[in-house]
Amino acid sequence: MKKTLISKLGLLGVISFLSYVAAVTFSPFAYEGYNPLAQAVSDLSAADAPSLMLWNRLSALYNVCETACVTVVCIAVSERKNKLFRTGVYLFAVMEWVSAVGFRAFPLSTSGFANTFQDVMHIAVTAVTVIFSVASLIVIIVAGAKDKEYRGIGVCAAVALTMMLVGALGMKIVPAAYFGVVERFSVFAATGFNAALGLCVFFGGFAFCKNAGQKAGTKTEQARVKEGTSESAEAERENIKNS
């Protein structure tokens, strides 16, 4: 089947994910003394970080493709009957836009937390994105549990939520020397799930489940028609005998 433009644009989520992975992987080489085991990813894009220029180059496609992808997903699911699933996707889209605009407008002023207005706003944006992330993923998980058509993406949402919780709890539990390790569970959860949504759209907008339902419905209808034809034939034979 020929892919529509909407389907093809679903791949923007994968491009966004790869751009983010490249930025997280290679930006530390431009930041002397950066310890990925202990430091947060946001330190790489701090206003005074020596890696800022490289980060901006490598992540150039990250925010653009991420917001474009989640917007495409919203369009793709807008006609779906499952209101709960649509709500979850819309909440996730709000989170992505808040994240893209908020973190670009308020990067950390320096590595760590300097308690400036910019840093406070960065933390506020983080709090909002976390709230919307958790809420959206829970809604999608529930939608997947109730409707088998969305069970696959519901499992992906459960994995993403688990990663977020591991990151959030891990940052409170593990020693400071390993803060960066658990923090990366959280930061990769959202962009990874965004890529998963985009891939679903690319491979038919969850149509594999929809088609399965259509095939089942078609078979049922064919059985009904066949049964009706048999009954009509039997009735006709009875009429002939009686006449």
Residue spans of the language-model regions?
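Long hydrophobic alpha-helical segments typical of transmembrane helices together
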Residues: 179-227, 234-243
